[in-house]
């Protein structure tokens, strides 16, 4: 019975070994005595439940090769398509992947047209599929194809398996993923690249979702150690640049980690040079568990058909006398330290003249591992210091022999700065002399023989080869030489386009290149942007640097491994040439020695290295029951799509919290009626509707940004040929000009409500692409086309500029009483014929127009002002006279289409004396006029009074633009301007007054704010609207195409004007006025001269106030204070006359005139009579002052003098009108002074002589009387001349002046109330007030 149990159990197994069982039965029958014991002892294990355990381990003599790799299972898997693969041991760490039996019957080899079938590649691939293989092939012989085919077949065989391709750098990873795709077409949805730039959490997700991974060894090592990498699913590992697998490099750590897990893994290692020594190659085999070595070189019979001729040339370059001298000097430094080492017992085993830095390093390591016996421990430090000095010195000597004197000198200088070498050599005389010798040689140039030879080789090469198609690589092991080579190549000429290709690490002398820059350099090199690359060791391996025709090795003292890598860059598709530059002596000898050792290594690797190396067993991975047969397949490969930095398809969206609480039915309903914005993202196209992007959209309150304006300008510039006039006019009227928008003037814009425009219709003025023609006549003409007058749909119209309207905090709109009105007619200059079109009409259609002012406030309503246009037309050239009111408003008018045809924007200027009778002058201005003393200020170039002038109007794009221009121009009281035309003459009298501009506040919700278009650049000829006198300077005329001043000009603070400057300017520029001034008895003694001389007056005491006492009586004037008597640079004067048309903005009204504050406060403390203080207080701000005019006053003594009058533009326009009707105008042009001009209270006449020491009281008492006399008191001063102001102030007692000023101010407070009611009118139409208030402060701050 004991024997039946195992027999019955064995019968249950279909694969029972019957022969073994029969022998056992026979033995049991023969030994009947102990049959029970013998049978039970042998068959007892078979009766145990785990029967398959014994069956999987039968006696060794009965086993076949198949039993080593395949384990029997008791139950077959349910999936008949994939058979589970079990290892030798059944445990939890067994592989979790199964093999596809159908796919395992074949293995695929590509036969695409771009991938020719090569015998050596096919043979190596067949071997690598079934064993761990080290493939050693020279560069360019197709190692990547072998790896791609192996990866693809394992991808087919194991549907759940994962394949890893490891490369030492990120560029190589990206390069290999594309190469493998182009060879076998592994689907991209299964491939991914994992580098250090991928976060660990994302890598964990990718390890589960992908199957083919291209990684760096460092990332693979970290993921395996952290458990992120699913090692149980790995079936194939490809290692590129396998010669790095030494020591504890990541390749070695990864393989050790994987071998610790009981898995079956296929390893394929690729390299061009496994090593230069047998020990190194054996180390690679051990670290990577290699079973087979596949080695090929260019001389093998199966490789020769695919390798082109590669010519190797070794050129011996003489070291040079200079380098030889330095080498001998260095040897004198080396000898003492080598002798000391020998005395200590260290054996260097070679002549010290032929030693290399590497050999010294090996000797030091040997000494550290086994110190010399008998050597005292205290001497170990001396031995180490000698080794350190020799290593540095031999390295300097190597640089000297390989690269020249300059790299050697730079290294020596760096080492002598700090560190142990510097401390050891600080007192060494030989090293100091060596450094001095290097400096001397470098000062004389010290050309490197290698550089000269290299340039010669390059020039000869490009004479034979086409520089556009030929490529050259120059290898240098030292970065310093890369710089020298680049400098030398820059002197060859245009045929050489060189660039450097170096590593990422930045040194002290040369900055490294990032991987992005490296890829860009290689791409440009392939495209032909460069034809020469100067590379360090980074260009030797790995990267695909296309086929080159010539390889130049600038240094020959490199290992055979690296030399093979360099040589592999040429001779792939065409014949190649390799030139090695070796200096005579040590460098050439070292090169020859290393080449000999390389040839010996090749012999060891012959026939797979079976006689020289020990290999490791590896699993077959494919069971023996499957015998895969090759199947040549032509792949249809899709185009490779590089993956971006961010995978949008992997964007993880978090489910909203409310959806987690919904039922499935509610979620379905929500998805039915709600579109997820993440699914369909709106992508606004910037080129879909280009026409609409040339115009801004309508806005309310919130204006378009500056960036929007820039975009619109760019779109208009791109569509210039197709950009219509109508579109441009729409753009101009709606938001901003077609030009620059850096500074914009804010104004009001009328809404679209028809009730706001009862009798006014929007008129669109087209200005884009208008061209002005320059003619020879003094007045420029305007040329318009029919297209310019096309009428478009109504748009918004600017009714008022910012200077005419303001908005308070409650939203009430206040319109100033002096806006400007523009009609849709244009004035043609006399030399311009009217356009002969069908739409040509005269101006008679607008003979009478009612103007409706805009009023949005119930409390501030204004009466409608009616302007009558009186028009006379005569065919023979009779003149038409247009009389307009002085108070006009800017508005849009209802005109017919016929009027639009000939209109650009007409200015209607009216004059009515009745309207100006009620004007009142301010008390300060009254005193200002009476005294006749005003600060000197430049004016426009003006002719004589009452002269006829030709008035020109510029081409403007909109009334708003023209209004700002006109507001910037000066105007004159009671001035008639006659404009001559071919068909009509227009004579207009204008009394336009400048008014300080007000800041426009925010409007209420019912109003729209717009921006007044004021372009910075005009391309139309502009004439001076106030004067076209022939004596006018060009500085005051804006020529065609001339860029105007920017709107917000920086404030210019000038020094005060000196007394006498005005009078000297009048005398020199207007000799006629000087002659008419017969009161002057003598001329000036000395003229104002450039240089360092002071301006000297004769006898008169100058009333002068020095700004903060900068110029004393003994100080000299600087060169920039000299008076420029010939210049008209009025923009540099202290007082701004608003001469620039475009410089009048709202910001000017908001500025505080600190110089006016200073001037008033200073004069309020001076001991001058009250009339001078009042006059000084009447001086105006450079930001609010209007144009300067001259008034000829009739004197009682029949004297005539000129006194300056600044007419400020204030709301009190009636008083200003009366003030300006004093007499006839005489326009005087005053030249501008220098930039540092001091201000002085002076008029065109001389100041009176005042004895300030003795007559303060007398003048104080006579203040009121002198104020009554007004201009007469000033006339008597004309008989005096100017005197030296510095000498005058040298005699003043300022303390007494301050005391007297305090006394005078106290008297003024007591008399303030009486003076406030007293009004003295010296001339009809003028009023007088001293301007002192009841509660005036003791110190006048100058704020009004």
UniProtKB/Swiss-Prot annotation:
Organism in which the protein naturally occurs: Arabidopsis thaliana (Mouse-ear cress)
Chief location bin: nucleus
Family the entry assigns: Belongs to the DEAD box helicase family. DEAH subfamily. FANCM sub-subfamily.
Protein function: Involved in ordered homologous recombination (HR) events in somatic and meiotic cells. Involved in the suppression of spontaneous HR events in somatic cells. Has an opposite function to the DNA binding cofactor MHF1 which promotes spontaneous HR. Functions in replicative repair independently of MHF1 and in a parallel pathway to the endonuclease MUS81. Acts in the same pathway as the two DNA-binding cofactors MHF1 and MHF2 to restrain class II meiotic crossover (CO), and acts exclusively with MHF1 and MHF2 during meiosis to repair DNA interstrand cross-links (ICLs).
GO BP of this protein: DNA recombination; DNA repair
PANTHER family: FANCONI ANEMIA GROUP M FANCM FAMILY MEMBER, FANCONI ANEMIA GROUP M PROTEIN
UniProt biased composition (Polar residues): 1207-1218
Region (Disordered): 39-61, 765-790, 1110-1148, 1183-1218, 1307-1344
Protein name: DEAD-box ATP-dependent RNA helicase FANCM
Gene transcribed to yield this protein: FANCM
């Amino acid at each position: 019975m004991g024997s039946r149990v195992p027999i019955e159990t064995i019968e249950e197994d279909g694969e029972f070994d019957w022969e073994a069982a029969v022998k056992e039965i026979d033995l049991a029958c023969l030994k009947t005595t102990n049959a029970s014991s013998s049978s039970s002892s042998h068959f007892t294990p078979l009766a145990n439940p785990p029967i398959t355990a014994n069956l999987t381990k039968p006696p060794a003599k009965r086993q076949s090769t198949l039993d080593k790799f395949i384990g029997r299972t008791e139950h077959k898997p349910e999936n008949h398509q994939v058979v589970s693969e079990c290892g030798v041991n059944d445990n939890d760490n067994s592989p979790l992947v199964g093999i596809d039996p159908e796919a395992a019957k074949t293995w695929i080899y590509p036969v695409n047209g771009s991938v020719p079938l090569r015998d050596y590649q096919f043979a190596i691939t067949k071997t690598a599929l079934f064993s761990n293989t080290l493939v050693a092939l020279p560069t360019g012989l197709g190692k990547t194809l072998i790896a791609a085919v192996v990866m693809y077949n394992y991808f087919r065989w194991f549907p759940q398996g994962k394949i890893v391709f490891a490369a030492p750098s990120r560029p190589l990873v990206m390069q290999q993923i594309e190469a493998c795709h182009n060879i076998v077409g592994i689907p991209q949805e299964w491939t991914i690249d994992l580098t250090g730039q991928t976060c660990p959490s994302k890598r964990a997700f990718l390890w589960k979702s992908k199957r083919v991974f291209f990684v760096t060894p460092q990332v693979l090592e970290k993921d395996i150690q952290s458990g992120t990498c699913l090692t149980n699913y790995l079936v194939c590992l490809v290692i590129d640049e396998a010669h790095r697998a030494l020591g504890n490099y990541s390749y070695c750590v990864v393989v050790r980690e994987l071998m610790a897990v009981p898995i079956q893994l296929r390893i394929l290692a690729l390299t061009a040079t496994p090593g230069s020594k047998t020990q190194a190659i054996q180390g690679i085999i051990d670290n990577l568990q290699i079973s087979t070595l596949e080695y090929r070189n260019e001389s093998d019979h199966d490789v020769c058909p695919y390798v082109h001729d590669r010519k190797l040339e070794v050129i011996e370059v003489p070291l040079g006398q200079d380098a030889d001298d330095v080498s001998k000097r260095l040897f004198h430094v080396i000898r003492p330290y080598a002798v000391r080492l020998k005395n200590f017992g260290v054996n260097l085993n070679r002549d010290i003249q032929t030693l290399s830095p590497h050999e010294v390093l090996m000797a030091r390591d040997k000494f550290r591992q086994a110190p010399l016996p008998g050597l005292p421990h205290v001497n170990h430090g001396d031995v180490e210091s000698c080794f350190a000095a020799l290593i540095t010195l031999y390295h300097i000597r190597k640089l000297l022999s390989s690269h020249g004197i300059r790299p050697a000198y730079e290294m020596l200088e760096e080492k002598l700065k700090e560190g142990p070498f510097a401390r050891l050599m600080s007192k060494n005389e030989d090293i100091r002399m060596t450094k001095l010798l290097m400096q001397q040689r470098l000062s004389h140039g010290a050309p490197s023989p290698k550089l000269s030879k290299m340039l010669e080789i390059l020039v000869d090469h490009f004479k034979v080869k086409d520089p556009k198609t030929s490529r050259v690589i120059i290898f240098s092991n030292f970065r310093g030489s890369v710089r020298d080579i680049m400098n030398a190549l820059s002197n060859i000429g245009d045929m050489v386009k060189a660039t450097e290709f170096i590593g990422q690490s930045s040194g002290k002398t040369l900055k490294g290149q990032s991987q992005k820059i490296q890829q860009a350099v290689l791409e440009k090199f392939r495209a032909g942007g460069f034809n020469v690359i100067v590379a360090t060791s980074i260009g030797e391996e790995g990267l695909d640097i296309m086929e080159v025709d010539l390889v130049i090795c600038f240094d020959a003292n490199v290992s055979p491994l690296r030399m093979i890598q360099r040589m592999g860059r040429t001779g792939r598709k065409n014949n190649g040439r390799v030139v090695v530059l070796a200096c005579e002596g040590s460098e050439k000898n070292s090169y020859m020695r290393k080449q000999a050792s390389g040839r010996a290594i090749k012999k060891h690797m012959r026939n797979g290295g079976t006689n020289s190396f020990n290999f490791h067993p590896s699993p077959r991975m494919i069971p023996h029951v499957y015998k895969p047969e090759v199947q040549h397949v032509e792949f249809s490969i899709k185009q490779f799509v590089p993956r971006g930095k961010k995978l949008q398809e992997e964007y993880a969206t978090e489910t909203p919290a409310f959806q987690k609480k919904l039922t499935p039915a509610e979620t379905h309903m929500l998805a039915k009626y709600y579109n997820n914005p993440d699914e369909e993202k709106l992508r606004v196209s910037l080129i879909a509707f280009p026409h609409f992007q040339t115009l801004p959209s309508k806005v309310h309150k919130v204006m378009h940004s500056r960036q929007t304006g820039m975009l619109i300008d760019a779109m208009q510039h791109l569509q210039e040929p197709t950009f219509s006039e109508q579109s441009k006019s729409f753009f101009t009227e709606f938001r901003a000009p077609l030009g620059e928008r850096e500074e914009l003037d804010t104004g009001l814009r009328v809404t679209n409500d028809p009730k706001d425009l009862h009798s006014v219709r929007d008129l669109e003025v087209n200005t884009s692409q208008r061209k002005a023609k320059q003619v020879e006549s003094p007045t420029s003409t305007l040329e318009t086309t029919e297209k310019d007058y096309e009428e478009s749909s109504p748009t918004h119209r600017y009714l008022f500029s910012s200077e005419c309207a303001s908005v308070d905090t409650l939203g009430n709109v206040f319109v100033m009483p002096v806006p400007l009105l523009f009609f849709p007619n244009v004035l043609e200059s006399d030399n311009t014929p009217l356009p002969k079109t069908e739409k040509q009409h005269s101006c008679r259609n607008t003979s009478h127009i009612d103007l409706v002012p805009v009023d949005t406030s119930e409390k501030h309503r204004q009466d409608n002002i009616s302007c009558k246009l009186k028009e006379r037309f005569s065919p023979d050239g009779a003149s038409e006279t247009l009389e307009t009111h002085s108070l006009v408003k800017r508005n849009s008018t209802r005109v017919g289409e016929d009027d639009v045809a000939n209109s650009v924007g007409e200015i209607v200027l009216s004059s009515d004396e009745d309207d100006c009778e009620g004007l009142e002058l301010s008390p300060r201005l009254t005193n200002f006029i009476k005294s006749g003393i005003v600060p000197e200020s430049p004016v426009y170039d003006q002719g004589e009074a009452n002269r006829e002038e030709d008035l020109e109007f510029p081409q403007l794009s909109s009334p708003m633009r023209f209004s700002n221009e006109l507001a910037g121009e000066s105007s004159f009281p009671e001035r008639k301007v006659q404009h001559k035309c071919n068909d009509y003459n227009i004579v207009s009298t204008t009394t336009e007054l400048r008014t300080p501009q007000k800041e426009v506040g925010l409007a209420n919700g019912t109003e729209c704010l717009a921006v007044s278009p004021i372009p910075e650049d005009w391309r139309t000829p502009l004439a001076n609207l106030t004067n076209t006198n022939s004596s006018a300077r060009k500085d005051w005329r804006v020529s065609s195409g001339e860029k105007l001043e920017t709107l917000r000009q920086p404030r210019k603070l000038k020094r005060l004007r000196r007394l006498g400057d005005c009078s000297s300017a009048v005398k020199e520029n207007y000799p006629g006025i000087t002659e008419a001034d017969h009161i002057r008895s003598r001329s000036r003694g000395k003229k104002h001269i450039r240089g360092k001389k002071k301006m000297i007056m004769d006898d008169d005491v100058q009333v002068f106030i020095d700004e903060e006492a900068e110029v004393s009586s003994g100080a000299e004037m600087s060169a920039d204070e000299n008076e420029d008597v010939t210049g008209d640079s009025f923009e540099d004067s202290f007082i701004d006359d608003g001469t620039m048309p475009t410089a009048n903005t709202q910001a000017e009204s908001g500025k505080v005139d600190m110089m006016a504050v200073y001037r008033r406060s200073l004069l309020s403390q001076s001991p001058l009579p009250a009339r001078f203080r009042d006059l000084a207080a009447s001086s105006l701000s450079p930001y609010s002052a209007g144009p300067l005019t001259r008034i000829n006053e009739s004197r009682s003594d029949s004297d005539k003098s000129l006194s300056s009058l600044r007419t400020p533009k204030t709301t009190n326009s009636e008083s200003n009108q009366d003030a300006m009707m004093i007499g006839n105008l005489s326009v005087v042009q005053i030249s501008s002074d220098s930039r540092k001009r001091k201000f002085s209270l002076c008029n065109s006449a001389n100041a009176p002589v005042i004895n300030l020491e003795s007559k303060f009281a007398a003048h104080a008492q006579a203040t009121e009387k002198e104020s009554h006399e007004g201009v007469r008191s000033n006339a008597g001063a004309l008989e005096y001349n100017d005197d030296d102001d510095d000498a005058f102030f040298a005699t003043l007692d300022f303390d007494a002046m301050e005391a007297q000023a305090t006394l005078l101010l106290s008297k003024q407070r007591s008399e303030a109330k009486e003076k406030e009611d007293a009004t003295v009118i010296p001339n009809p139409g003028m009023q007088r007030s001293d301007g002192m208030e009841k509660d005036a402060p003791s110190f006048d701050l100058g704020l009004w």
